[in-house]
Amino acid sequence: MDRYLEAVSIALVTEIVKRAIGPDPVKRPWEQQMEKLDLKKARKALFNAPLNRFVPIEVPPLAYLMADGQGDPNAAPEYKLALASLYATAYSVKFACKAKGRDFVVSPLEGLWSAPDPESFTARRKDEWDWTMMIMVPDYIDEEMFLEAKVRSECKLGKLIASLRLETLEEGLCLQALHVGSYDDEGPLLAKLHDEIMPEGGYGFGGRHHEIYLSDPRKTPAEKLRTVIRQPVRKT
């Protein structure tokens, strides 16, 4: 699935949001030793996988900021609004937590992708795609903190996507692999997963196609982009 242009827009939206929110506040003396939670390190297994080789992983329930949409992400204004809403709210939550003594690193963007017809992906009929873009947050973020951050973000941006929410994602047993290269080159790896690995292992689909975008497309050549591909499964 070719989403390189989308990833570029992700980077641009991130910069716009950071400018809208303002810089990370200057550290006060008591903040110098404040521990900063990095979920990529704390939950390392979720962000790592063998290159081009799917392995089973049990994914625990995880808290995410989420936003939904439908259609071609490269053309849909809704997609850019979703990203702006997610990043603005994620940074708003982060700064609020930091002011109370609990800082964290904003996690990489993730996406859930689906379509009524799986061939929509291989045929690149992007107008048929359904997507949910997500940013993982610490599990101590509650609904009240989210709603407060949402209000602040809306004041900054003027408008947020209506589907923005805090939700727990439960995937359970998954198969996960690392793809290095252009998003357009994921096809053969996905075909092997769907046509060989899952049938031979007695697995059926247990959830939506899940991608975790580890690379910064502004600084990374397309052939070196790192994407974790995750597929929730169930035993048939």
Identify the residue ranges that each predicted region occupies.
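Accessible peptide chain termini
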Residues: 1-2, 34
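Intrinsic-disorder-associated, low-complexity terminal segments enriched in Asp/Asn/His/Tyr and depleted
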Residues: 2-4, 24
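Short terminal hydrophobic/aromatic SLiMs and anchors at protein ends
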Residues: 10, 17-19
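A solvent-exposed interaction/effector surface
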Residues: 28-236
